[in-house]
């Protein structure tokens, strides 16, 4: 399979695949007589795993560690779970922060609707911007 077909199958770019190859996340593919990269099923599966991990916001260095644990023993499975637990905590933190942001936005919207003041002034006041009177 050529790189364009692989990229299309994965829903990523050719540049992304080349980058992952440069970073050592996938083995270099064989080359055709015309010097084109020729990818196989192993590349497809490995890149699919990498893309799924990236969608979960797992860093490339962590993905590399996970790929090195391919034939996971019990100890290695614990390492995989450690990485996943870290990301679960990070996602929970982000969810909490986003929920807080959502509430602040709702409050601000309600104030702009129910207040006779200039909506832009209200927005700036709630953004933490300090007003200074110029003489």
Curated annotation (Swiss-Prot):
DNA-binding region of this protein: 4-23
Biological processes annotated in GO: positive regulation of DNA-templated transcription
PROSITE patterns linked to this entry: HTH_MERR_1, HTH_MERR_2
HTH merR-type domain ranges (all copies): 1-69
Gene3D superfamilies for the chain: 1.10.1660.10
UniProt xrefs under InterPro entries: CadR-PbrR (IPR011791), DNA-bd_dom_put_sf (IPR009061), MerR-type_HTH_dom (IPR000551), MerR_fam (IPR047057)
Keywords: DNA-binding, Transcription, Transcription regulation
GO molecular function: DNA binding; DNA-binding transcription factor activity; metal ion binding
SUPFAM superfamilies (alphabetical): Putative DNA-binding domain
Domain of life: Bacteria
Function according to Swiss-Prot or TrEMBL: Transcriptional regulator.
Protein name, UniProt field: HTH-type transcriptional regulator ZntR homolog
Organism: Haemophilus influenzae (strain ATCC 51907 / DSM 11121 / KW20 / Rd)
């Amino acid at each position: 399979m050529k790189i364009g077909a692989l990229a299309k199958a994965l829903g990523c770019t050719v540049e992304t695949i080349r980058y992952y190859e440069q970073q050592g996340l996938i083995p270099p593919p064989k080359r055709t007589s015309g010097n084109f990269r020729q990818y196989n099923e192993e590349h497809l599966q490995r890149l699919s795993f990498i893309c799924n991990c990236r969608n979960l916001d797992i860093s490339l260095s962590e993905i590399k560690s996970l790929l090195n644990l391919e034939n996971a023993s019990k100890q290695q499975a614990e390492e995989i779970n450690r990485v996943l637990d870290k990301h679960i905590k990070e996602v929970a933190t982000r969810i909490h922060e986003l929920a807080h942001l959502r509430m602040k936005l709702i409050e601000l919207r309600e104030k702009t609707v129910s207040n006779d003041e200039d909506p832009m002034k209200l927005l700036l006041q709630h953004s933490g911007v300090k007003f200074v009177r110029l003489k």
